[in-house]
């Protein structure tokens, strides 16, 4: 790791961010990113905030300032989407988003004049793509990942016997969301500043629910209705973009429409494909090899290089090729089905279904256990002041398989919680 020269406030926040389930390994580049986005004083204040939603009164108590001053600071941070804000039971709350998916992306989801976005893009590229510690922590360390692939619904015939659950459909996420926003694609916008972007649509990044509502109110997303949302999805399909969204069944907060060249999830899937950095869909392409003409269109559009042309073993035409699938790398997105002129590729169910966490709490608990950081989630900065938050986390732990419960108990090292897990699990 490079020599760290960050000042105290940025170092405090870097350590704080690294306690999120997905982590944010300290780095010279991380400190530089933070220094572009905020002052050292702001970094020190943010570092003291809990993971769970909190009120201005709570922040004032933590910072030891008046509530009026706390509100002024919090609103300024929310205006720059370093914090998100929302109303819970009639009372305004704030929450510190993780770096990704979170304030890293938010910083590039519109054109801004208050920060140097070109410099920021270069720093993101170095920290995320070149150094690799962050991307490995985000996409590789553990079985449960941040995001998952949604199958292209147009590749599943309506008269097919295949069953697609509602939580596997982007269309259902759009149709059922209370709020939906669309913003600039963080990945392609970043690459644009580096002179490496492709010509895929830029304004097509989707957010939902309370995240979308906060981004919309602060000018980082444009509110769209269900009809326009479905039109944007159709546009993404037309451009052979992959739908990569939050790895939860309920209350999905984001869906990115990813190209293979710019988008970090797809880059990670190519680099670390055998480690399953992105959860796949529950479908897999199947090729009728006798009908394959070897045109290579599926190879061209596959974002993770899971498709290739191999010898057709045709003695009459020894140079003849056919498409082949690397099942260990395939995300099950379906873009290959859409472009096949011979219509010899179809989507079929995977032999083993992929388990999707129920909600964000379930996902966070699973990620924390697998990455050895559950104690950070539970004994976070004053997080236990909320019995509701504690109950949600313990409830998710108690629903885990026995092996995961044992791992959780070992990590927490709390007599009370350990005994509770043992009692409920019969261990």
Predicted region positions:
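Short, amphipathic alpha-helical interaction segments positioned at domain boundaries
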Residues: 91-131
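Short acidic, hydrophobic short linear motifs in intrinsically disordered regions
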Residues: 52-63
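Flanking helices and flexible, charged tails adjoining ferredoxin-like Fe-S electron-transfer domains
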Residues: 318-427
């Amino acid at each position: 790791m490079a020599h760290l020269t960050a000042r105290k406030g940025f170092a405090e926040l870097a350590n704080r961010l690294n306690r999120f389930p997905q982590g944010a390994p300290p780095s010279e580049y991380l400190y530089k990113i933070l220094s572009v986005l905020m002052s050292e004083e702001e970094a020190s204040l943010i570092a003291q905030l809990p993971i769970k939603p909190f009120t201005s009164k709570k922040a004032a108590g933590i910072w030891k300032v008046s509530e009026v001053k706390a509100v002024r600071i919090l609103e300024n941070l929310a205006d720059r989407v370093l914090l998100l804000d929302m109303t819970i039971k009639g009372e305004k709350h704030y929450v510190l988003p993780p770096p990704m998916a979170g304030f890293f992306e938010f910083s590039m989801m519109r054109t801004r004049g208050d920060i140097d976005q070109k410099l920021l893009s270069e720093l993101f590229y170095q920290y995320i793509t070149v150094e690799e510690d962050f991307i490995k922590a985000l996409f590789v360390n553990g079985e449960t990942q941040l995001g998952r692939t949604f199958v292209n619904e147009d590749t599943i015939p309506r008269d097919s016997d295949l069953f697609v659950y509602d939580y596997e459909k982007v269309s259902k996420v759009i149709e059922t969301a209370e709020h939906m926003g669309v913003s600039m694609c963080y990945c392609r916008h970043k690459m644009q500043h580096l002179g490496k972007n492709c010509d895929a649509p830029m304004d097509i990044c989707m957010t939902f629910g309370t995240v979308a509502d906060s981004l919309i109110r602060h000018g980082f997303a444009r509110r769209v209705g269900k009809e326009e949302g479905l039109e944007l999805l159709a546009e993404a399909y037309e451009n052979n973009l992959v739908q990569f969204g939050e790895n939860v069944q309920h209350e999905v907060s984001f869906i990115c429409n990813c190209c293979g060249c710019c988008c970090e999830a797809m880059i990670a899937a190519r680099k670390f494909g055998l480690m399953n950095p992105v959860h796949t869909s529950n479908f897999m392409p199947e090729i009728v090899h006798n009908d394959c003409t070897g045109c290579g269109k599926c190879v061209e559009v596959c974002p993770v290089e899971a498709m290739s042309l191999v010898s057709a073993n045709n003695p009459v035409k020894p140079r003849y090729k056919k498409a082949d699938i690397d099942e260990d790398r395939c995300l099950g997105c379906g873009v290959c089905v859409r472009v096949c002129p011979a219509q010899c590729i179809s989507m079929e169910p995977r032999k083993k279904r992929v388990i999707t966490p129920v909600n964000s709490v379930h996902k966070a608990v699973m990620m924390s256990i697998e990455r050895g950081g559950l104690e950070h989630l539970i004994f976070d900065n004053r997080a236990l002041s909320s019995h509701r938050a504690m109950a949600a986390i313990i409830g998710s732990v108690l629903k885990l398989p026995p092996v995961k419960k044992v791992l959780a108990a070992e990590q927490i090292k709390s007599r009370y919680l350990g005994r509770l897990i043992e009692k409920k699990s019969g261990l």
